[in-house]
């Protein structure tokens, strides 16, 4: 009876390491990597041999080598987003690193991309179908709060076009509009809030009209 095929790894369950030393394979199945390479571990079901990918190549790595000779990267997508490193971010996504993972502050990679003003990173993250726009971190801030506070009107515009909520308050009870540090951001947010308010009022009037017609 043949072994069942391994289950595909779920996004977010990928472990990421940076190699501290070069590893020379002894068999064709093993993965070659050099010092400084990023390794994405996708299968740890065998305690001795883990399956990993580096630079687009996939192979086996002795688990003890990874444990002893590699440095764990806890939030690679966040690191790529903070640095504005588009190629690393794309590599993380290609290797199924979870797009909505939270760091110790409760922030997403999208939050850090907006905080740093990295428009190309934001656009790349927006290509992910399950991207969470409105995640609030431990301070209650969303990606929209970060973009408004840092004064990146182009990113505020992107977030609003994607459907980011303007009515979420952080733990200081501040909306993204309250955090805006320049007129361009404030204007975009005020306009969107006004549109949303009109839409809500219109919906309420429709509801009342329906009741009247009963």
From Swiss-Prot:
Sorted alphabetically, which PROSITE patterns does this protein's record hold? ANK_REP_REGION, ANK_REPEAT, SH3
Q: What are the TM regions of this chain, as residue ranges?
A: none
Q: Which residues carry this modification: Phosphothreonine?
A: 200
**A Gene Ontology BP annotation from the UniProt entry:** ossification
Q: Give start and end residues of every ANK repeat.
A: 72-101, 105-135, 139-168
Tissue specificity of this protein: Ubiquitously expressed. Present in osteoclasts (at protein level).
Its main localization is: cytoplasm
Q: What does this protein do?
A: Induces bone resorption, acting probably through a signaling cascade which results in the secretion of factor(s) enhancing osteoclast formation and activity.
What does UniProt say about this protein's domains? The SH3 domain mediates interaction with SMN1.
Q: What's the protein called, per UniProt?
A: Osteoclast-stimulating factor 1
Designated gene of the protein = OSTF1
């Amino acid at each position: 009876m043949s072994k069942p095929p391994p289950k595909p790894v779920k996004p977010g369950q990928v472990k990421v390491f940076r190699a501290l030393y070069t590893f020379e394979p002894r068999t064709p199945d093993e993965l070659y990597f050099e010092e400084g390479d990023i390794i994405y571990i996708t299968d740890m079901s065998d305690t001795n041999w883990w399956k990993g990918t580096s630079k687009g190549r996939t192979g086996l790595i002795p688990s003890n080598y990874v444990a002893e000779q590699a440095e764990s990267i806890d939030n690679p997508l966040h690191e790529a987003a903070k640095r504005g490193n588009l190629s690393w971010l794309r590599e993380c996504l290609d290797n199924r690193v979870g797009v909505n993972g939270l760091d110790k502050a409760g922030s997403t990679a999208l939050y850090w991309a907006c905080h740093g003003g990295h428009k190309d990173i934001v656009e790349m993250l927006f290509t992910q179908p399950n991207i969470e726009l409105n995640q609030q971190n431990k301070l209650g801030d969303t990606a929209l709060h970060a973009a408004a506070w840092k004064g990146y009107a182009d990113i505020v515009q992107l977030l609003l076009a994607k459907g980011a909520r303007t009515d979420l308050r952080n733990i200081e009870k501040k909306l993204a509009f309250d955090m805006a540090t320049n007129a361009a951001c404030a204007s975009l947010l005020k306009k969107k809030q006004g549109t949303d308010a009109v839409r809500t009022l219109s919906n309420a009037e429709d509801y009342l009209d329906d009741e009247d017609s009963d």
